[in-house]
């Protein structure tokens, strides 16, 4: 029996090869795999000796040979194939263990284009696909985690079962598809082409979820193959607590996205059902958290918390005072972990030091939404710099009002449309979102904020279609307003702001969120 081993991921390689030899397999290999096996004293033959054809073009052509692919693809149940293989001296290959050149890792390292191109595997995918196609006669192993199961079946049954071969086949085609998708994505990025004519996405399963958004829905969590430099939920380390749910992950991502709007100072964000119910910044993290929680303590119960500085004991103690679903932060002090360990179901996620950096920013990537029969892609929304804002009222905002408008505008982008946000310079005061008309969003925010809205800034994610929403905001006590503008009634809105003595700024950019 012949087995061909050629792997870039050498985890478990030597024990697997030793097990195959014990079972009577003769091994073929190339390059670094060959050297690793020889170095471990495993008997192995060079592929070029088997094919009687040298490796050429600096190793670009090693396994692309009839004695390899004929041995893999031969349909042994067909007499014609067997006779043809015999005539050409082709021996069947019954097991192929291959994983591909480290293309993704090379891209992630920042390597130059020529080096990346050399890591586009040709022979490997050809062998994997050929082996998977002929799964009735060939076991194809692309994942070292499958080595023990394959060896166990060979030892117990003298063969790999059809069920296992079918499972390995599916895994193999998924492996090559993801590999090609990564190459395609890199080439599109190199060309500055965000929306290619053909789109392939490559993700790997992080975990099966207990269920989806609701218990009757199935769910799973997938992530990119390589961890980005920016902080993410997908690559955060879970330190304690219950298994993450589908809704936890969505809310954690929403919390992290909003938190990254405030990298310069300690900040706290509380999210409930993908909606901000508390946001604050302060010189001390514990004060930021307490201020954020005080915005809406009822909604904060059972919420998701995101923090952008290491969690200290004081902040941990403050969080332990109420029921929370999950917390994501750059890190936790030993004392904080000791405090939070008493909350055994509380999920603690560590996003890493990048989240604590004053230069932390959201990752520049596309947002995807599935629709029936297709998918929508768009650039991730961003907040334009205040330099592009235009004062249109008679009265210019004071420095304090300008700071409050900046804060409100950053938060407003993260509230479902129609979105209205009242804020001071360092905290959310109230928000109203998800309504089908803007004046109702204003009124909901007013009901939540009450007297705290006096002297506040109000932000609207899109223009006010009528002055009624602005009139209500003024009645609530807002002294300044930031909005995109662009309504046919802009002049009427500006006049209303002047009538109320409000400062009005137009950003020229809308931030709908659906």
Curated annotation (Swiss-Prot):
For molecular function, the Gene Ontology terms on record are:
IMP cyclohydrolase activity; phosphoribosylaminoimidazolecarboxamide formyltransferase activity
| Stored Pfam families | AICARFT_IMPCHas, MGS
Alphabetized, the UniProt keywords read:
Hydrolase, Multifunctional enzyme, Purine biosynthesis, Transferase
**UniProt superkingdom:** Bacteria
EC number from the UniProt entry: 2.1.2.3, 3.5.4.10
Q: Name one GO biological process term.
A: 'de novo' IMP biosynthetic process
Q: Locate the MGS-like domain: which residues?
A: 1-142
Q: Which stretch is the leader sequence?
A: none
Catalytic activity entry: (6R)-10-formyltetrahydrofolate + 5-amino-1-(5-phospho-beta-D-ribosyl)imidazole-4-carboxamide = 5-formamido-1-(5-phospho-D-ribosyl)imidazole-4-carboxamide + (6S)-5,6,7,8-tetrahydrofolate; IMP + H2O = 5-formamido-1-(5-phospho-D-ribosyl)imidazole-4-carboxamide
- InterPro entries (UniProt xref): AICAR_Tfase_dup_dom_sf (IPR024051), Cytidine_deaminase-like (IPR016193), MGS-like_dom (IPR011607), MGS-like_dom_sf (IPR036914), PurH-like (IPR002695)
Answer whether the UniProt record assigns the keyword Transferase to this protein: yes
Query: Does the keyword field hold Transferase?
Result: yes
Per the record, GO CC terms?
A: cytosol
Q: In which pathway does it act?
A: Purine metabolism; IMP biosynthesis via de novo pathway; 5-formamido-1-(5-phospho-D-ribosyl)imidazole-4-carboxamide from 5-amino-1-(5-phospho-D-ribosyl)imidazole-4-carboxamide (10-formyl THF route): step 1/1; Purine metabolism; IMP biosynthesis via de novo pathway; IMP from 5-formamido-1-(5-phospho-D-ribosyl)imidazole-4-carboxamide: step 1/1
The Swiss-Prot or TrEMBL note on domains reads:
The IMP cyclohydrolase activity resides in the N-terminal region.
The record's comment on protein family reads: Belongs to the PurH family.
Q: Which PANTHER family match?
A: BIFUNCTIONAL PURINE BIOSYNTHESIS PROTEIN ATIC (PTHR11692:SF0), BIFUNCTIONAL PURINE BIOSYNTHESIS PROTEIN PURH (PTHR11692)
* Protein's name in the database: Bifunctional purine biosynthesis protein PurH
């Amino acid at each position: 029996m012949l087995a061909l081993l050629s792997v870039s991921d050498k985890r478990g390689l030597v024990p697997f090869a030793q097990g195959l030899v014990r079972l009577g397999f003769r091994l073929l290999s190339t390059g670094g795999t060959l050297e690793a096996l020889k170095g471990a004293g495993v008997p192995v033959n060079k592929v070029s000796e088997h094919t009687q054809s040298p490796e050429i073009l600096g190793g670009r052509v090693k396994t692309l040979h009839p004695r390899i692919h004929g041995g893999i693809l031969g349909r042994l149940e067909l007499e014609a194939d067997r006779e043809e293989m015999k005539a050409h001296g082709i021996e069947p290959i019954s097991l192929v263990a291959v994983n591909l050149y480290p293309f993704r890792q090379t891209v992630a390292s920042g390597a130059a284009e020529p080096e990346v191109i050399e890591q586009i595997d040709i022979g490997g995918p050809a062998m994997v696909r050929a082996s998977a196609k002929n799964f009735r006669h060939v076991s194809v192993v692309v994942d070292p985690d499958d080595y023990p199961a394959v060896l166990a079946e060979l030892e117990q049954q003298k063969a790999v079962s059809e069920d296992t071969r079918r499972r390995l086949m599916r895994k193999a085609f998924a492996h090559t598809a993801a590999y090609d998708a990564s190459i395609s994505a890199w080439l599109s990025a190199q060309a500055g082409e965000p929306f290619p004519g053909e789109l392939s996405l490559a993700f790997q399963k992080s975990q099966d979820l207990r269920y989806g958004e609701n218990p009757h829905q199935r769910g799973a969590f997938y992530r990119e193959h390589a961890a980005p430099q920016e902080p993410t939920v997908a690559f955060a380390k879970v330190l304690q607590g219950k298994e993450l749910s589908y809704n936890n992950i969505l809310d954690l991502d929403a919390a992290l996205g909003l938190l990254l709007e405030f990298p310069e100072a300690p900040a706290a964000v509380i999210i409930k059902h993908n909606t901000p119910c508390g946001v604050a910044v302060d010189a001390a993290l514990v004060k930021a958290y307490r201020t954020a929680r005080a915005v809406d303590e009822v909604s904060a119960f059972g919420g998701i918390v995101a923090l952008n500085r290491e969690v200290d004991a004081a902040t941990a103690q403050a969080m332990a005072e109420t029921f929370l679903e999950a917390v994501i932060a750059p890190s936790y002090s030993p004392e904080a972990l000791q405090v939070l360990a008493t909350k055994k179901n509380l999920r603690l996620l560590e996003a890493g030091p990048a989240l604590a950096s004053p230069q932390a920013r959201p990752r520049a990537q596309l947002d995807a939404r599935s629709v029936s029969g297709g998918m929508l892609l768009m650039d991730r929304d961003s907040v334009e710099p205040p330099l592009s804002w235009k004062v249109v009222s008679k009265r210019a905002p004071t420095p304090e009002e300008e700071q409050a408008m900046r804060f409100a505008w950053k938060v407003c982008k993260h509230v479902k449309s129609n979105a209205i946000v009242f804020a001071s310079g360092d905290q959310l005061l109230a928000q109203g979102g998800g309504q089908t008309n803007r004046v109702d969003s204003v009124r909901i925010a007013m009901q939540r904020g009450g007297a705290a809205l006096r002297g506040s800034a109000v932000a609207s994610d899109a223009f006010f279609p009528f002055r009624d929403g602005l009139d209500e905001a003024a009645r609530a006590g807002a002294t300044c307003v930031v909005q995109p503008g662009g309504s046919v009634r802009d002049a009427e809105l500006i006049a209303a702001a002047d009538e109320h003595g409000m400062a009005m700024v137009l950003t020229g950019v809308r931030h709908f969120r659906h």
